[in-house]
Design a protein with these regions (language model features):
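Short, well-formed alpha-helical segments that are part of the catalytic scaffolds
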Residues: 13-28, 47
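Short, conserved active-site loop motifs that form the nucleotide-linked donor/cofactor pocket
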Residues: 4, 35, 61-62, 118
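Short helix-capping segments at alpha-helix termini
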Residues: 28-33, 55-60, 88
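Short beta-strand/loop segment that forms part of the nucleotide-sugar
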Residues: 33-43, 64-66
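Hydrophobic targeting segments
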Residues: 2-9, 17, 24, 35-40
Length: 130
């Protein structure tokens, strides 16, 4: 089974990240992949609190903590570097933690990746997630 890692940067918006993880869990149900989520905490000043309802369709949810606030792009770069060096995976899907990216689109990315395995798949947001 192919392994997918969803990479989510966050700064202080733990409520939105919790909602995103719940939505991902719902939307990956029945897909023939193993899903894990890595949340990269950009040195949030608010208490870290994930309130996740259900993880039935996810292998794991882990949080990486940045030592200092470095910004959205640096969180993604740090997460990608960590994944490349430490994880066994076929695909990485970066998703904003604030609802900008829609979890229901994951299946379309994976369909395209299976159809064109040697290509990088890029999406364009036309509608905010919620």
């Amino acid at each position: 089974m192919k392994k997918i890692i969803i990479l989510v940067p966050v700064y202080n918006d733990w409520q939105s990240v919790s909602k995103l993880i719940d939505e991902i869990n719902i939307n990956v149900k029945g897909l023939d992949f193993e899903f894990s989520i890595i949340v990269v905490n950009d040195a949030s000043t608010e208490t870290q609190s994930l309130n996740i309802q259900n993880l039935d369709n996810l292998k794991s949810v882990r949080v990486m903590n940045m030592k200092e606030n470095r910004g959205h792009a640096r969180c993604i770069a740090t997460g990608l570097k960590y994944i490349y060096e430490n994880e066994d995976f076929e695909y990485v899907i970066p998703m904003d933690g604030d609802g900008e990216d829609r979890p229901e689109e994951i299946k379309f990315f994976l369909e395209e990746a299976n159809y064109s395995p040697d290509k990088t798949i890029v999406g364009e947001r036309v509608k905010r997630g919620w």
